Amino acid sequence: REAREKETKALSLSRALEEALEAKEEFERQNKQLRADMEDLMSSKDDVGKNVHELEKSKRALEQQVEEMRTQLEELEDELQATEDAKLRLEVNTQAMKAQFERDLQARDEQSEEKKRLLTKQVRELEAELEDERKQRALAVASKKKMEIDLKDLEAQIEAANKARERRVKQLRRLQAQMKDYQRELEEARGSRDEIFAQSKESEKKLKSLEAEILQLQEELASSERARRHAEQERDELADEIANSASGKSALLDEKRRLEARMRQLEEELEEEQSNMELLNDRFRKTTLQVDTLNAELAAERSAAQKSDNARQQLERQNKDLKAKLQELEGAVKSKFKATISALEAKIGQLEEQLEQEAKERAAANKLVRRTEKKLKEIFMQVEDERRHADQYKEQMEKANARMKQLKRQLEEAEEEATRANASRRKLQRELDDATEANEGLSREVSTLKNRLRRGGPISFSSSRSGRPQLHIEGASLELSDDDTESKTSDVNETQPPQSE
């Protein structure tokens, strides 16, 4: 809106200048007409009174035009002052916008620092949870080893009991075969569990690498923030230099070139920052791909855990079947193998407890994995927010640079308009002074001519110091142009003989 007002004022100044030039041309035409009237006055003495009256009338019209030109000049000076005031308001608005932008930028920096602290706290909590999970897995491994030792002892006892019962009970042989099948299935379950633990370790490694990548992204984001603050500081310095350069118009051109070089340097730094942001975005995409891979592996781990649960349920069903068969066998060989069966029942009960404990640990591990996955999703959402904020800061920086360039162009245009208005005002002032001086000279000459004509004095020519011939009427002179000298001389020569007679 201020730019449109300045354009309107510039157009008004141009129109006023054109009107002043037209008034000047009209003044020159009237001056020529006045000279022609004076020539007619010299050619005919009978019409002297009428010509003098017309000369006075032309003089009054000329004085009125001079007064109008003075009024127009004052209006031009008022408009020039209004242009200067608009320029000052533009500078004040520029400073206010810069201060507001600095306050907004500081608030965003504080928000970014707060989010960064929260993110660091969450990462530390996640590391503590991962450490607890590692401890739980270490305990699970120790329990697994103990269970394997107990299982080996149980196998040895079962083999000894089977050797003693092979020759006696066919049903016990079938029980041994079933126990072997049970052991084989237990081994398969143990292998599946080992595979799950290996996959969990691999997930831990990938999670550690992902944490390292997140830390690297945070460092790069911090370096990007430092670069942005440096660019903003240089931009503020540049704005201060632009504001200070308005006070010294004599060194404005050199300062403008230096500022333009500085602007180009800032643009190069901005392009470098953009390339860094692109690299950061590429790394973020790679990290996202790694997270997707980790999610797929977690899904596979869940599937394996589900299979292990199914195997455990099958083992429990087989265990129930074995209990039923043991109860049937107990009725037949209760007197001979009561102690062995009691030991087997105790071992089976212990094995069931261990299976239940393992199921609880597996459920706790799955719960911890889900919680870890949720934490990772939250972290990546925060990283995405940080990247989006960085893009917003970048866009705001570009808008600020564009706004600063626009304000700079408006300032230069206002200075050019002020310079042109000053030049037009000086030119009009010179023309007005010349017209006033010419009017005063003509007024004096007309008054002298009027007085001399009333007294009936002779008319003669003489040459002035400017080289132009002058018409003398008993001491009064009227300066004539070189173009009119010949015609005026001939007219006067024709007029002089009657006077001498």
UniProtKB/Swiss-Prot annotation:
Which stretches are transmembrane? none
Residue stretches in coiled coil: 1-457
What do we know about how this protein assembles, alone or with others? Muscle myosin is a hexameric protein that consists of 2 heavy chain subunits (MHC), 2 alkali light chain subunits (MLC) and 2 regulatory light chain subunits (MLC-2).
**Record keywords, A-Z:** Actin-binding, ATP-binding, Coiled coil, Cytoplasm, Motor protein, Muscle protein, Myosin, Nucleotide-binding, Thick filament
Q: Which SUPFAM superfamilies match?
A: Myosin rod fragments (SSF90257)
Originating organism: Oryctolagus cuniculus
Q: Where in the cell is it found?
A: Cytoplasm, Myofibril
Principal subcellular localization: cytoplasm
Functionally, this protein is described as follows: Muscle contraction.
What does the record give as the organism's lineage?
Eukaryota, Metazoa, Chordata, Craniata, Vertebrata
Give yes or no: UniProt keyword ATP-binding: yes
Q: Which Pfam families match?
A: Myosin_tail_1
Q: What is this protein called?
A: Myosin heavy chain, embryonic smooth muscle isoform
Q: Which domain of life is it from?
A: Eukaryota
Instruction: Please note every region of biased composition (Polar residues).
Output: 492-501
